[in-house]
Amino acid sequence: TGSSNLKKFAAYLAVLVLFSCRPLVTTFDDIQDAVTFTSASKTDEPTSVDNLKVMTWNIRFGAARIPWFGDSCGDRVLMTESDVIANMDSIVSFINTELPDILLIQEIDMSSKRSAYMNQVQYILDNTYFNYGAYASMWDAEIIPSAGLGKVNVGNAILSRWQITDAERIQLPLRTDQDDLTQYFYLRRNILKAKIALPITE
């Protein structure tokens, strides 16, 4: 029954809390350092810039057109590794065609079960000409019970040809129309702010 299943899940959560070294859900300070990344193989940084091309893209955690349950357009919850790699390679190909200097990304996954635990920030860095990245999570949970979603870490990222410094995650207000348990497991939206060392002489 539903009541029995709820009790079993509550007991499962209690065991996780007792024996886990980290909380089920990561909470954040109002302002804290973002996570930074570097490409495994850096490319030469442009030493001058006449026109700066900035692109923004919600990559939907590499799901492409997969009918995902969370968008109310299907019933898929988890992708296979081959799904993720194929979709991420398409994203990488588009980036390498458009050649933005700075890329602002929304809904990029880091070690989430639904996207085969891929570090998508590092994957894009290592397969494009971008040298530096900064990441701010908006949803970092060891387990999300909905539909077997499991471990989730998704957020915003900035990728750049040039050095990124002073990257900060700025917490936005949480929703106030949810009960405490729902709010605990829900998104923690944020602003990702950073400085980029553009080759501009004053």
Q: Predicted regions span which residues?
A:
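N-terminal, active-site-proximal structural segment of metallo-dependent hydrolase catalytic domains
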Residues: S20-N153
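Conserved beta strand-loop-helix elements of the APE1-like EEP
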Residues: D126-Y129, K151-A167, I196-P199
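Residue-level detector of beta-strand structural context in well-folded domains
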Residues: T43-E45, A157, L192-A194
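Extracytoplasmic ligand-binding site segments that recognize negatively charged/polar headgroups
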Residues: G148-A157, Q183-L187
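Active-site catalytic loop in hydrolytic enzyme cores
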Residues: W162-T201
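Internal, well-ordered alpha-helical segments in soluble enzyme and binding-protein domains
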Residues: Q120, G155, R188-L192
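Bacterial Sec-dependent N-terminal signal peptides
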Residues: T1-D33
